[in-house]
């Protein structure tokens, strides 16, 4: 990346947050992949009524995964342009669109138990647990990054169900169209005090 005209690092991998869903299950139930907040909450209620968790996910193995959900809600509710303005200091993180995003995430996560049934379950589950939950219809969907494609395919290898993915829905009227949030997963840099920067390059 470049900042203030200075080159700091080269991208190694690009990743995106996505919403995986059990395509076979959705077709069986006549559910549509949500693109708006109303559709999102409607299908979530239908999933819960069918005795399943809305999303499979957990943080036991890597607690910073909380930032993934925060980022999804900030961008889907406040919009990526507003998030960018906040990142460069042109907006305050206490502005209503950001507060609303976090309040909605709290409602869905704490009050409604969208992730693995409850906040307690979310904190207790690890990578293998929530992948198994998704593959076995314990949950109808999973919010995660594109780095999970291999593990998800392996989890469904012995299943007759098919899985697919879609962008996370827009959570506020007038927000941006559904989009895949692209980010750098890893970067390559050379220590500024390296004795042999050219050789390292």
Predicted features, each with a name:
Residues 37-42, 119-135:
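Short helix-initiation/N-cap motifs at beta->coil->alpha
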Residues 44-46, 88-122:
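Glycine-centered hinge/linker elements that transmit conformational signals in sensory
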């Amino acid at each position: 990346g470049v900042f203030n005209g200075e080159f700091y690092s080269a991208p190694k991998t690009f990743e995106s947050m996505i919403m995986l869903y059990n395509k076979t299950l959705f077709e069986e139930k006549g559910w549509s992949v949500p693109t708006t907040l109303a559709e999102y909450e409607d299908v979530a209620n239908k999933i819960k009524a069918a005795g399943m968790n809305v999303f499979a996910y957990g943080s036991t193995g890597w607690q910073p995964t909380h930032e993934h959900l925060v980022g999804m809600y900030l961008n889907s509710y406040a919009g990526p342009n507003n998030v960018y303005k906040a990142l460069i200091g042109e907006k305050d993180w206490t502005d209503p669109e950001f507060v609303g995003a976090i309040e909605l995430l709290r409602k869905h996560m704490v009050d409604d138990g969208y992730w693995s049934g409850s906040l307690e379950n979310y904190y207790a589950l690890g990578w293998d647990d929530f992948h198994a939950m998704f593959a076995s219809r314990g949950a109808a969907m999973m919010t995660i990054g594109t780095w999970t494609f291999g593990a998800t395919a392996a989890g469904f290898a012995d299943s007759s169900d098919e899985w697919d993915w879609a962008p996370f829905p827009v959570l506020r009227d007038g927000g941006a169209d559904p989009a895949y949030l692209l980010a750098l997963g890893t970067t390559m840099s050379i220590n500024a005090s390296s004795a042999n920067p050219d050789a390292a390059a």
